[in-house]
């Protein structure tokens, strides 16, 4: 972002938040390419240079506006595959530029916010594991959780309208609206049943940005309610009767206050101090210390408000209210729950002694072994029952290369699931990968696993079999027994910014 700020001069267009001139700037697409969008379809298929030139971008935009879709039928894409390939080419290149440009105002705002709050290591806040220490500190004191699967918007126009509040450039929004509508139309001619899924896969960065900006709009209701609930907790009921405008705003938002006499009865809905909200991708969680009736009211109020103002249709089967004490929450590749940890304390007063039974709530995180085995079976590391199988590999791959690939997968899973309370499930996953690697090598050499290991020795798999704990104590040979005990407990890392593909059970 510092490089972008050097290129972005304070011109008159940028002072008014105009982003359309940036679409025709050469360095924008160079930055977009360098940021890891991957090689474009143009550079892969047609042999052009990796960097999208300004002339190519201008031609693509002109062709979009001049394209006559009434002369195109689904049979044309079958007879002329070059047309379908060009369609994906247009969307890929333009979406890369769009995704990079629309992120600029948000990135600049984030940088100024972090500098104002003097947050140095902001990358630690992006870690997925940073959510779990928050859950450990707060969820053990809560009772019920509202599990919500957020639906996608019914139309792409809703995404553009949401972005309009942040980007004040009508020309950029018009081009974005035209691109989204025309691309969906093109794709529906080729693959009618997979238009939206194909769009999200080929233009993942742009789609995620538009979707997250839309979700953040209706998540702002929690900020409003939190601020007002903080005010309500420090305000007497006599003063509240005079705040007609405030109650009118609350009534419009959540339909709580219907009559003046209902103020005292319904005030507790927005006074609840222990309401916590977290979200990752399409799954959001709302946890509270209140009762089941309290959570049902929140469900009705919030869902009604979101559907009315943001055109989101929440299916009743996608919203669950569960009690934390007897329900496991599947979130970010973990099964999280709050369980009672019984403990017995012996107390003695003079000659009399007695036992005191204490039950302490403890936040527990486990590795979901069944979905994880299903993910391994999907990529042919084992069968559906969890029995390791060999993977077909190319004959030109060396043994060390095969071991390195298996070992990297094992270390990544161990790294991501290091916060598990029980390591037994994780050890089983390591066993599956270890034996699958051995069977793959034996299959390559046309031998059995036992004969292969006996002939080459177990030192061949030494690097693969080494666990993270062994690596830790090889790095720090004088480690104490206290640190060894700490390692066996849960560890959350602050360098994980994406969920592991195998841990993402979909």
UniProtKB/Swiss-Prot annotation:
GO cellular component: chloroplast
Any single biological process term in GO: tRNA processing
Chief localization: plastid
SS bond list: none
Classification via Pfam families: Intron_maturas2, MatK_N
Listed InterPro entries: Domain_X (IPR024937), Maturase_MatK (IPR002866), Maturase_MatK_N (IPR024942)
This protein's record includes keyword Plastid: yes
Entry keywords, A to Z: Chloroplast, mRNA processing, Plastid, RNA-binding, tRNA processing
Location in or out of the cell: Plastid, Chloroplast
GO MF, one example: RNA binding
Cell inner membrane keyword on record: no
Domain of life: Eukaryota
HAMAP family: MatK
Job description of the protein: Usually encoded in the trnK tRNA gene intron. Probably assists in splicing its own and other chloroplast group II introns.
Family membership: Belongs to the intron maturase 2 family. MatK subfamily.
Protein name, UniProt field: Maturase K
Originating species: Uncarina grandidieri (Mouse trap tree)
């Amino acid at each position: 972002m510092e490089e972008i700020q050097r290129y972005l001069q304070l011109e008159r267009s940028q002072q008014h938040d105009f982003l359309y001139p940036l679409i025709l700037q050469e360095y924008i697409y160079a930055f977009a390419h360098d940021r890891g969008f991957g090689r474009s379809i143009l550079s892969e298929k047609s042999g052009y240079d990796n960097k999208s030139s300004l002339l190519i971008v201008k031609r693509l935009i002109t062709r979009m506006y001049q394209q006559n879709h009434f002369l195109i039928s689904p049979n044309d894409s079958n007879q002329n595959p070059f047309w379908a390939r060009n369609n994906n080419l247009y969307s890929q290149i333009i979406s890369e530029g769009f995704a990079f440009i629309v992120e600029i105002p948000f990135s600049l705002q984030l940088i100024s916010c972090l500098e104002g709050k003097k947050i140095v290591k902001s990358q630690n806040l992006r870690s997925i594991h940073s959510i779990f220490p928050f859950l450990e500190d707060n969820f053990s004191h809560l009772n019920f959780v509202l599990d919500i699967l957020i639906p996608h918007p019914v139309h792409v126009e809703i995404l553009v309208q949401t972005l309009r509040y942040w980007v004040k450039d009508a020309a950029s929004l018009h081009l974005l609206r035209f691109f989204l509508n025309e691309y969906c139309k093109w794709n529906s001619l080729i693959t009618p049943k997979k238009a939206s899924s194909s769009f999200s896969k080929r233009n993942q960065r742009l789609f995620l940005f538009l979707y997250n900006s839309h979700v953040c709009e209706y998540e702002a209701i929690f900020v409003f309610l939190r601020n007002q609930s903080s005010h309500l907790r420090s305000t007497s009921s006599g003063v509240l009767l005079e705040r007609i405008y405030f109650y009118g705003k609350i009534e419009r938002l959540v339909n709580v206050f219907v009559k003046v006499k209902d103020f005292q009865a319904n005030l507790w809905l927005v006074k609840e101090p222990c309401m916590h909200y977290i979200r990752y991708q399409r799954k959001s969680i709302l946890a509270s210390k209140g009762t089941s009736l309290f959570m049902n009211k929140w469900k009705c109020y919030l869902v009604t408000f979101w559907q009315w103002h943001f055109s989101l249709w929440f299916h009743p089967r996608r919203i669950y209210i569960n009690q934390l004490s007897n329900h496991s929450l599947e979130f970010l590749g973990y099964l999280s729950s709050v369980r009672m940890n019984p403990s017995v304390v012996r107390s003695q007063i003079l000659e009399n002694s007695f036992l005191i039974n204490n039950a302490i709530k403890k936040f527990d995180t486990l590795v979901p072994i069944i979905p994880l085995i299903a993910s391994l079976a999907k990529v042919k590391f084992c069968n559906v029952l969890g029995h390791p199988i060999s993977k077909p590999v190319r004959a030109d791959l060396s043994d060390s290369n095969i071991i390195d690939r298996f070992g990297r997968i094992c270390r990544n899973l161990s790294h991501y699931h290091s916060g598990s309370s029980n390591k037994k499930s994780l050890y089983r996953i390591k066993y599956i990968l270890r034996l699958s690697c051995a069977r793959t090598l034996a299959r390559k050499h046309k031998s059995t696993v036992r004969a292969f290991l006996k002939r080459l020795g177990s030192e061949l798999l030494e690097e693969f079999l080494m666990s993270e704990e062994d690596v830790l104590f090889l790095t720090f040979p004088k480690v104490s027994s206290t640190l060894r005990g700490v390692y066996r407990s849960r560890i959350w890392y602050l360098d994980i910014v994406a969920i592991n593909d195998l841990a993402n059970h979909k």
